[in-house]
Structures are given as C-alpha cells and as structure tokens.
Amino acid sequence: GGGTGLQVVIIGSGSGAFAAALKAVEEGATVTMIERQPIIGGTCVNVGCVPSKIMIRAAQLAHHQRAQPFDGIERSEPIIDRRTMLAQQIARVDELREAKYESILADNDNITLIQGSASFEDAHTIAVALNDGTSKKITADRILIATGSTPALPNVEGLADVPYWNSTEALFAEKIPEHLVVIGSSVVAVEIAQAYSRLGSAVTIL
C-alpha cells in the first residue's frame, strides 16, 4: 500500500485515532499511539456515548414502570439504587473498552501504545513526557492529532464557588439529586436532563 514503511504517530487513543491506526497498518505503516490518560478509548466509550446511552436506557425503563401506557398492567414507582446502576454501567464500559480498543493493541504488533503527554519539537519529531516520569523522542513520517474533546465550562459568574457538574460527572454521579439545574440545551444537556428527571430529580433547564 501507499503507507508501506512509513512511521506514523497518532496523538490520542479514541475512536478516530484507532480508525486511523488500523487504516495506516492496513496500508503497511507502523503506528505509535500516544495517550496521556491512564485508560485508552477516548471520550465515546469512557465518558460519552456508551455510558450516556446506558444511563438513558435505564432511565427509560424507570419511566415505563411509572408511566407505561397499557391498561391492565399495574404502574408503580421504581426504586432507584443509583450505586448499583453505576456499577453495572462502569462494568459495561470496561467490557466495551477491552473489546473495541485494548484487544486491538494486544492483537496488532504494528501498533504500539505509549502513555504520556506529547509535544512537537519540529514537523517530524515528537517529545513525550511519559507518565512514569521519564521522557523520549519519536521521529515520524506522518503525525495525526486525534485528541478528541473535553467538557467546556461557560463563563458564569460564581460558577467556581458551587459544586457544579460537567457532563462526565453527571454520568458517573453516585446519587440522584433532588433538584438538578442544567445550563444549556444541547443534545448532551437534554439527554442528561431527561435521564435525571426520569430517575427522580426535579430538573430545570436554563
């Protein structure tokens, strides 16, 4: 393929990074993947799509128990054990991360993972501050930045003085709050708002 013999560095280890790594290897390249977090997989499997869909589905079932539309089937208020729900959610996330990401590294000798923070020295050289406290330099023919996303905090006066959640903290909270205020109305905001409402919180969207 067109990538035969190329040394490729990919900064990040999410779905985009792995898709690029597999394609590069398919074309004959050798890939070094750099990830500064202690776990691989990026946003979707760890703190995004996967845990959110698990929580949304659980909340939907709670809602159906309370408000299903069929006469002759008794409706009842669900008993929510958030910690047990969360333990199952985390276990499923771990399972999918192993299946979709960790197993690829284990089965592919042409993809190497380095855990540390990357910085550019020049167009073809990456310096890596390794998580173990050491450092190394990597030279590459191609470098892909696939560092993904992180929650953005709005510039709201007084926000730093209150125990706010970002989307990740909302997905992994151990308790259902009595009242949740959601600032914003994006898809993520409304999904979280609906889930918490169905699990028993009073929810206000601003």
Locate the predicted segments by residue.
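An amphipathic alpha-helix/helix-turn recognition signal
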Residues: 15-19, 84, 113, 184, ...
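Glycine-rich flavin
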Residues: 1-5, 23-176, 204
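Beta1/beta-strand and adjacent pyrophosphate-binding region of the FAD-binding site
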Residues: 2-14, 176-186
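N-terminal Rossmann-like FAD-binding beta1-loop-alpha1 element of flavoenzymes
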Residues: 6-33, 189-198
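Gly/Ser/Thr-rich beta-alpha loop segments that engage phosphate groups in nucleotides
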Residues: 14-16, 43-44, 50, 150, ...
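Rossmann-like NAD(P)H-binding beta-loop-alpha module
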Residues: 174-206
